[in-house]
């Protein structure tokens, strides 16, 4: 895209795009690639599959740009978030507004480039057609899941009962993360590899269960993670008022004082480190962290069980088992 950026004079967008795709875990492309191998074995020419899988990282970058803007996050992977990077280009009182506007456009451009990269990856027209519905569903699910996450943080979802809040958190967990991060990428690769229905079903179960465990690990890191490892300030989920499964478990398990204290801290501007320590102590004391750790372990075990008995390539199976560990046993 360098030539287009030069012709339009929008080289700052290309520079920011490079920064957005630097680092990261590359898990979604990995699940896509090994989903294909599970169905069809290693491709003779891996280039088209690798390009198609890599396009998922451009999609992910586009969503992270918008996610950081929605959350007001200053950093991503230890560097300034996209809107802060753009903001630094313009001195004066309108810098923040420019940064926000430019970040919206950068996210849109990355989304477009992701689609272009997939379509021009060199896959056969038949393969592109087979995969189109999986990719379209994946995009829609993550965007609607993101809306639910934002709505819950702002109090625009049903909070009338603990069950209603838990239902919203479960939907966010499934659609914003589990399907988007693991299930759909694995199904996309398997669909490209012409997987039979039985294998697609096994990968779907594996993907949803493992994706839940992946997000629960993120939720724990969002409260207890080391900023040096995560690249984001500790306690951001508390600052942003995220009512994750972890937080809702603490609210449900806590006594009246613990519940009211934690509830009052969620989404409150200007939280101090002492406030965040209080929130962490409540989450620990109520057993919420241990409960989520147990749920991660159980979901991961169930995900691996879903692969048993499924007819798939041995190397693909082994890689999917390895990826399960990488997705859940991590510090970033």
Language model regions located:
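Residue-level signal for inorganic ion chemistry
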Residues: 31, 114, 145, 247, ...
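Alpha-helical scaffolds flanking conserved acidic
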Residues: 42-59, 100, 128-135, 199-210, ...
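Short alpha-helical scaffolding segments that buttress acidic/His motifs in well-ordered protein cores
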Residues: 16-17, 35, 53-56, 135-142, ...
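Divalent-cation-assisted or electrostatically stabilized phosphate/pyrophosphate-binding catalytic cores
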Residues: 76-107, 157-178, 201, 205, ...
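Conserved N-terminal diphosphate/IPP-binding helix and adjacent helical/loop segment
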Residues: 1-56, 61, 65-66, 70-92, ...
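Short hairpin/turn module used for nucleic-acid contact or packing/dimerization
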Residues: 277-332
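C-terminal helix-coil-helix/basic helical segment that borders enzyme active sites and/or dimer interfaces
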Residues: 38-40, 46, 189-198, 221-229, ...
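All-alpha helical catalytic cores of prenyl diphosphate-utilizing isoprenoid enzymes
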Residues: 3-6, 20-28, 104-112, 119-224
């Amino acid at each position: 895209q360098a030539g287009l950026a030069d012709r339009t004079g929008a080289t700052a967008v290309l520079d920011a795009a490079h920064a957005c795709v630097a680092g990261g875990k590359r898990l979604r492309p990995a699940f896509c690639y090994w989903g294909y191998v599970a169905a069809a074995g290693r491709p003779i020419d891996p280039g088209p599959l690798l390009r198609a899988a890599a396009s998922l990282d451009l999609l992910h970058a586009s969503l992270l740009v918008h996610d950081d803007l929605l959350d007001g996050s200053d950093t991503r992977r230890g560097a300034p978030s996209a809107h802060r990077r753009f903001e630094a280009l313009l001195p004066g009182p309108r810098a923040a507004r420019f940064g926000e506007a430019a970040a919206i456009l950068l996210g849109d451009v990355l989304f477009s480039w992701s689609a272009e990269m997939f379509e021009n990856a060199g896959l056969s027209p038949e393969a592109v057609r087979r995969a189109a519905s999986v990719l379209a569903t994946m995009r829609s699910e993550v965007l609607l899941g993101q809306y639910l996450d934002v709505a819950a943080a702002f109090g625009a979802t049903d909070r009338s009962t603990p069950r209603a809040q838990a239902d919203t958190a479960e939907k966010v967990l499934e659609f914003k993360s589990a399907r988007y991060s693991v299930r759909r990428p694995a199904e996309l690769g398997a669909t490209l590899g012409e997987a039979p229905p039985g294998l697609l079903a096994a990968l779907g179960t594996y993907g949803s269960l493992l994706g839940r465990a992946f997000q629960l690990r993120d939720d724990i890191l969002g409260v207890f993670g080391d900023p040096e490892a995560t690249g984001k300030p500790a306690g951001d989920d508390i600052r942003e008022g995220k009512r994750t499964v972890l937080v809702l478990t603490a609210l449900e398990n806590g006594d009246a004082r613990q519940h009211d204290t934690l509830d009052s801290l969620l989404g409150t501007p200007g939280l101090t480190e002492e406030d965040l320590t209080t929130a962490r102590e409540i989450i620990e004391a109520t057993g919420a962290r241990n409960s989520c750790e147990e749920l991660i372990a159980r979901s991961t075990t169930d995900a691996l069980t879903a692969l048993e008995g499924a007819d798939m390539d041995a190397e693909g199976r082994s890689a999917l088992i390895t990826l399960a560990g990488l997705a859940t046993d991590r510090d970033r």
